[in-house]
Amino acid sequence: MGGDGTLLGVGRKSAPYGTPILGINLGTLGFLTAEEKNHAEYAIDKVLAGDYKMEKRMMLQATIATDMERIEGILALNDICITRGLLYKILEFNIYVNEEYVDTLRADGVIICTPTGSTAYNLSAGGPVLKADAQIIAITPISAHTLTSRSIVVSADDVVTVEINPREEADFTVSADGQDAW
């Protein structure tokens, strides 16, 4: 019970166990939750009676690798974002898909999102809305410093690598669903 933020956090924590989630909205938006709080008892009764439809949503798994450390197993239901830190310096990203160079972006950040996350930060950054059950990922620049930088859509089976230009002293943050950050 909670809002979309609660559901995102529970989704990341329960994903390794394959535990289904029933979201009851107590927050303000409730885009991801199945029911409103005034229908909670009814929704729970339906689930207990076996009268429900389960939606499977894809998740992202990320690894952060720097010269200093390697953090693996980062999960996200909505998105993984790499954004500039406290310094107001634009970042330069090299984007690779399956180890093949795709593009260089100069931007405030980059969003890698699932179809679930495509209607969140990705949409606000001008990215595409993806069909909820599609097995695809969008890569969207945040405030790109060029007119030609646009979102890239790839298969969920593809491995996306974002490399921050090593020539820069980059101050950046990596976040999962806007909640956990490194």
Task: Report residues per predicted region.
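N-terminal glycine-rich "phosphate-gripper" loop used for MgATP/nucleotide binding
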Residues: 1-4, 12-13
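Short glycine-rich anion-binding loops that position phosphate/pyrophosphate groups of nucleotides
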Residues: 3-6, 29, 116-118
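Gly/Ser-rich helix-loop-strand patches that form or flank binding pockets
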Residues: 9, 14-26, 31
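Catalytic core of DAGKc-family lipid kinases
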Residues: 29-108
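Structural signature of FAD isoalloxazine-binding scaffolds in flavoprotein oxidoreductases
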Residues: 48, 131-133, 139, 144, ...
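ATP/nucleoside-binding phosphotransfer catalytic cores, i.e., glycine-rich phosphate-binding loops
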Residues: 69, 82, 98-101, 149-182
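Short aromatic-centered micro-motifs
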Residues: 95, 117, 174
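Gly/Ser/Thr-rich active-site loops/lids in small-molecule metabolic enzymes
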Residues: 104-107, 112-148
